[in-house]
Amino acid sequence: TYDSAYIIAEDKYGSYGICGFYVLNKTCKTLEHFLFSCRIMNMGIEDFVFSYLEKPHINIVLPVSSFLGGTSNWIKLVDNLDLKPIEVKKQASINILFKGACDLYSVINYISGDCNIDTEFPYWNKQLIYILSHTHTAFIEQTHRLPYNKLMELTKSFPFPHPDEFKTKFFSKKYDAIILSLLTTTYRGLYINKNDRTYVEYGYANCDITDENNWDKVLSSIPEKYKEENRLLLKVFKEEYKFAGDPPVELVLKNLEYIRKNLADKTELILILGSEIPTQKALEGYEDMAKKHITLNKHVREFVKNYNNITTLELTDLIQSDDDYNECINHFSRRVYNAFAQKIIHIVNSKLGKAYLQLKEL
């Protein structure tokens, strides 16, 4: 027999919705599925659920974002916590878009005020394909620049990108501020078509899939019977695409120039720059990220000097110790997300000339 459930969480800052699920085989007391969203990192919810289930056997498949074993005695189980209905947005004075990794949800949960907030984060689509590439500056740029038919052509030769990567409201004239994180742009692998200069994105920037020396690593997670056909696909990909760089500094600056030129003049563009303080906490693909952040950030700062409607937010300034990192250089403690939100509030209010945003009251 099986016990299965999904988990809903909320705290004094807001509701996190469905943030995890499990499937417990009660006969052999084994967790067959146990998965949680990065929205609730550092809250101890996975530890609490694991303890509540009396710590059954679990086969942990690495890499993971956290390890089980904490106490989480600050969490309370209730039987009346329901999914909140989606509220119809009220007319607000300003409109804001957050675009980047999904842990930005942790920032938004601290923000309130006279605003409507839209988000464009990675997500699993209906075909259970992870839609992530759209957060890269190159995808933002080409989605606006290229006609729809050309974008759809990009989806036909290889398993990536999926058509959903090109769905966006980024260039809508309604936004008064756009918060764009450059963290995914820094660590994701970008490739340029040798003929028409279009872009596709795949994997991590530290593993160039046009380099045959990396193919065994790229194919390591694929069942043996499918490896040869995928190796042939990589050969075709190598003939058609070249690696953009790690990080692709000149290309990112070109993307940002296009983005700023094609946004409404009133839209304040706030760029999130990754932390330059090293940490020993590193998931696969995130190695040496501090050095990469230093390289890209230096050029972005110079680029921004030419504009009065672009602001940078330096995550480096928010880090006080290694405890502020959770699992890697791009995920943070609750204290950092709170400080992150305060920085956003200050920048938006200062640039728009009025205190539209505020920190949520406890």
Q: What spans do the regions from the language model cover?
A:
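Acyl-donor binding region in acyl/amide transferases
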Residues: 9-12, 18-82
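Well-ordered, non-membrane alpha-helical segments in soluble/globular domains
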Residues: 51, 159-164, 242-259, 286-301, ...
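Catalytic nucleophile-elbow at a beta strand-turn-alpha helix junction centered on a G-D-S/GDSL motif
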Residues: 93-140, 178, 183-184
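Short loop/turn segments at strand-loop or loop-helix junctions that form parts
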Residues: 100-101, 175-196, 270-277, 314-318
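Surface-exposed cleft-lining segments at the edges of enzyme active sites
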Residues: 149-155, 190, 203-254, 281-289, ...
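Acidic carboxylate-rich catalytic motifs and surrounding loops in phosphoryl-/glycosyl-chemistry enzymes
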Residues: 273-275, 309-326, 359-361
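Substrate-gating cap/lid alpha-helix
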Residues: 276-315
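Histidine-centered active-site loop/cap adjacent to the catalytic His
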Residues: 324-362
